[in-house]
Amino acid sequence: MSNSSLVNYTRISPNKSSRNGTKIDMVIIHCVVGQASVESLGSRFAQSSVGASSNYGIGADGRIGMYVEEKDRAWCSGGVDRYGNPIRVNGISGADIDRRAVSIECACDAYAPYKINDKVYKSLIKLLADICKRNGIIRLKW
């Protein structure tokens, strides 16, 4: 399993775990509220107390950062409800989704409608194509 050659910045997060042999067949795209940089995302994910991470992030300038290698599971979609039960989407826990997915955080505006600028969109499209090609993902659903 390889990582994207499109990466401009790397800061590996301690917030990760094994994919347990699960094949990558999804990509998760999240928006970081505020025009974040790849460095600020790296600083945030470097804090073990945050308990969150992403495989990649795209800063407001369009640069791409890597925080968790694709061979590892980023802690992006997991979580528990107020009773400590795993949050589920269509019956699948966030941890199970994270094991199947490569996650990407994208810089956006701080206020609704949380617009993503053209530099971020262009980098996102290139990164998605690269991830899909390397992992044999034929079709993405939005």
Feature names for model-found ranges:
Residues S2-R139:
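Active-site-adjacent loop/helix surface patches within enzyme catalytic domains
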